[in-house]
Amino acid sequence: MRVHDQRLRFDVTPKPMGLNGSSLITARSVALLLFLSLLLLILPPFLPPLPPPPATLLLLPLLLMILLIFLAFSPSNEPSLAVEPLDP
């Protein structure tokens, strides 16, 4: 059984963005956003009003924010990565 040396090749040349479907903003995504925007403008007058959410549900975003702030300022258990020169 032979093992072949396979190397990955990466193409790093910049390519122009076109309307061929590979760009981030396509005609389909723009049409979808316009459709959803129109629905948000048209539907509220026809739908019945919703009751207010329970008080505990209103505390959920506050609790999530407190948790995220705590995690942002807590020290990590990973050792710090130091960059060392390659010269011996």
Curated annotation (Swiss-Prot):
Region (Organ Size Related (OSR) domain): 25-76
Factors inducing expression: Induced by ethylene but repressed by abscisic acid (ABA) and epi-brassinolide (epi-BL) treatments.
Residue intervals passing through the bilayer: 30-50, 53-73
Alphabetized InterPro entries for the sequence: ARGOS/ARL/OSR1
Function: Together with ARGOS and ARL, regulates organ growth and final organ size. Promotes both cell expansion and proliferation-dependent organ growth, in an ANT-dependent manner.
Localization in the cell: Membrane; Endoplasmic reticulum; Nucleus; Cytoplasm
Family: Belongs to the plant organ size related (OSR) protein family.
Tissue expression profile of the protein: Mostly expressed in flowers, and, to a lower extent, in leaves and cotyledons.
Origin species: Arabidopsis thaliana (Mouse-ear cress)
Gene Ontology terms: biological process: cellular response to abscisic acid stimulus; cellular response to brassinosteroid stimulus; cellular response to ethylene stimulus; positive regulation of organ growth; post-embryonic plant organ development; regulation of cell division; regulation of cell growth; regulation of ethylene-activated signaling pathway
Record's protein name: Protein ORGAN SIZE RELATED 1
First-listed, main subcellular location of the protein, grouped into a coarse class: membrane
A GO CC term assigned to this protein in UniProt: membrane
